[in-house]
Design a protein with these regions (language model features):
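Fe(II)/2-oxoglutarate oxygenase catalytic core
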Residues: 1-176, 182-208
Length: 208
């Protein structure tokens, strides 16, 4: 593994760790390689899960393009590296009971106004898909440099005090941002340029 650095390893507020940050897991060359791999596969319009479990397109809630990637021989090195980081984050900050993960999402916010409104990654809708209801620890990885876009901030609401002024995690290429899947978060509207990221979800038994 490349040398690791930690920025604010655990952001704590009222004994809660809403996010955990790691830097330098992937080199710049590796990030280029990941981006090229994802771009080659293409993208499709992102959708959302409604309260009744229906999966629909809703530009007011989510306007971006995505593609899901399952683990295979070609991308195994990505999963191996991310697994090590998940283990560190979970050990240091959360101690969740996790079963692992087998896919990731490539996300592209490629025009003005592209966004993903406030949401949780774990679904409480009436669905049987364990990939939606079993999410416990989320990870967002910034693929491109912050100079390539404006807006698109990754923001979180953790209590009543942060509703009006959400916590904004600073952009940095390659930054890993871990957070519990029940944390309310969003990608603010992109003002210019293109924002690219990977998203992983580690699954496990339901929160008790």
């Amino acid at each position: 593994m490349n040398s690791m650095s930690i920025l604010n390893p655990v952001y704590r507020r009222d004994n809660l760790a809403p996010f955990y940050v790691l830097d330098d897991i992937f080199s710049s060359e590796e990030l280029d390689r990941i981006t090229a791999y994802c771009q080659q596969a293409g993208t499709e319009k992102a959708q959302v899960v409604q309260s009744r479990g229906m999966i629909v397109t809703d530009d007011k809630l989510r306007l971006s393009d995505i593609m899901m990637h399952r683990a295979n021989r070609e991308n195994k090195w990505i999963f191996d590296r991310v697994l090590e980081a998940f283990e560190m984050a979970n050990r240091d900050a959360y101690n969740f009971e996790l079963d692992g993960f087998n896919q990731f999402q490539y996300s592209v916010y490629n025009h003005q106004g592209a966004h993903y409104e406030y949401h949780m990654d774990v679904s409480f809708a009436s669905v049987s898909d364990r990939f939606l209801i079993g999410r416990k620890l989320s990870l967002s990885i910034m693929l491109n440099d912050e100079s390539e876009f404006t807006g698109g901030e990754f923001q979180m609401i953790i209590d009543s005090q942060t509703i009006e002024k959400p916590i904004t995690v600073p952009h940095k290429r390659g930054r890993f941002v871990f957070f519990p899947a029940f944390m309310v978060h969003r990608v603010a509207p992109v003002k210019s340029g293109t924002r690219k990221s990977l998203v992983f979800w580690a699954l496990g038994p339901k929160f008790r």
